[in-house]
């Protein structure tokens, strides 16, 4: 709005009222230890990405919390102790935490290609 006052103009800024925050209702979730690692991955990924990720986890550990007897690799994603450290994470006995760590590793290593790029690499090299 422009108001003329004598020979000068005064501009008044008209601002919208503050936005009312939207109420967001989240699904009720069971405690973390009761959540299935596959379901967490399925919620975080597209259908195609989940299929690729599930292929890798199936090959690495059959989605089980396993320790590799010949290296420091452990968990669903068979990540090395050094990989956990590089991700700023700690080794966990939770398959959900292991799955999130594997997704973080894939995101860092393969970027936008994600789990399907990791699967393509796995098919050529038998590791990701």
Model-derived segments and spans:
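Catalytic cores of secreted/periplasmic lytic hydrolases that degrade extracellular macromolecules
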Residues: 109-111, 121-128
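N-terminal prepro-regions of secreted/extracellular proteins
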Residues: 1-31
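Solvent-exposed loop/turn segments at secondary-structure junctions
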Residues: 61-64, 83-86, 127
């Amino acid at each position: 709005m422009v108001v003329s006052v004598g020979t000068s103009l005064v501009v008044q800024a008209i601002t919208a009222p503050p936005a009312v925050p939207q109420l967001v209702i989240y699904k009720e979730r069971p405690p973390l230890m009761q959540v299935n690692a596959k379901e967490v991955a399925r919620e975080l990924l597209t259908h195609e990405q989940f299929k690729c990720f599930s292929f890798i986890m199936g090959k690495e550990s059959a989605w089980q919390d396993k320790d590799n007897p010949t290296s420091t690799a452990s968990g669903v994603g068979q990540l090395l102790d050094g990989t956990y450290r590089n991700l700023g994470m700690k080794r966990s006995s939770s398959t959900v935490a292991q799955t999130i760590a594997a997704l973080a590793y894939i995101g860092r290593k393969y970027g936008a290609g994600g789990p399907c790029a990791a699967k393509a690499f796995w098919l050529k090299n038998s590791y990701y």
